[in-house]
Amino acid sequence: MDKRELIIHMLRQLDEQSRSIQQIGAGYYSCVPFARRFNKLLAEARTLFETSDGLMGTFEEIPEFDPKDPADKMKIIQGIRVEINQLISLLEVAEEDASQ
């Protein structure tokens, strides 16, 4: 398994964990571990590309912030999940292009 596949696998697991923790409800979770892990995986994914131009340049680190309001927490987790899935898509397409 190459680095790209490992990152994709880890991103999928992070998405699954964020989904399950969000189902607990009432905001009894922290957003920080999810943002922190996403940022680390994003940094690793960037090393797979020659430059940060193009689509990889559209990704930004997610602030490691933990609001008190449950609705705000849900918005942050949803944003993280969107970024996770977009990054997975980019990595999968880049993998397909590399194999052709």
Write out the residue ranges for each language-model feature.
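Short terminal alpha-helical segments
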Residues: M1-V32, I84
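General helical structural elements
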Residues: I7-I8, E16, L41, E50, ...
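Generic low-complexity, intrinsically disordered sequence content enriched
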Residues: M10, D15-S18, F59, L91-E95
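Enrichment for repetitive, rod-forming helical segments
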Residues: M10-L11, E44, I80, I88
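Amphipathic alpha-helical interaction modules
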Residues: Q17-E60
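Amphipathic alpha-helical binding modules
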Residues: F65-Q100
